[in-house]
């Protein structure tokens, strides 16, 4: 859940779609994929029915493999260090560069990114760090898992970003 420009409740995914469409990005593939997930109730089957780049498929597979471990400390670590602790700083740099382009149609995208920065940086990030500490406690094996899987999450995210960068 989130709020839009007029402070109305909305779905964060809808903010993403609106911001992408405003800058002229084609959102048909993501909409088709989400529709396939809903219809199939199985992400792997939905992937097979969708035109998704291998880099994105690999990233999704890694994500679902982590979920399949059913180990809360691993799932939380990957989420925290592969996303919550990382993305706000990245988005701040994107927002700064977009703000420097006069006349661009980036208001919706800026709003979407700023919402991420606010939610992830101010609220989710600090809470996630406390959660990891609580889940791992004094168990060195859990901390080792957290480090191992978080490092792999970063590698997977870099591979995805490298692909995205090559397509821009």
Residue ranges, per PLM feature:
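Non-heme di-metal
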Residues: 1-168
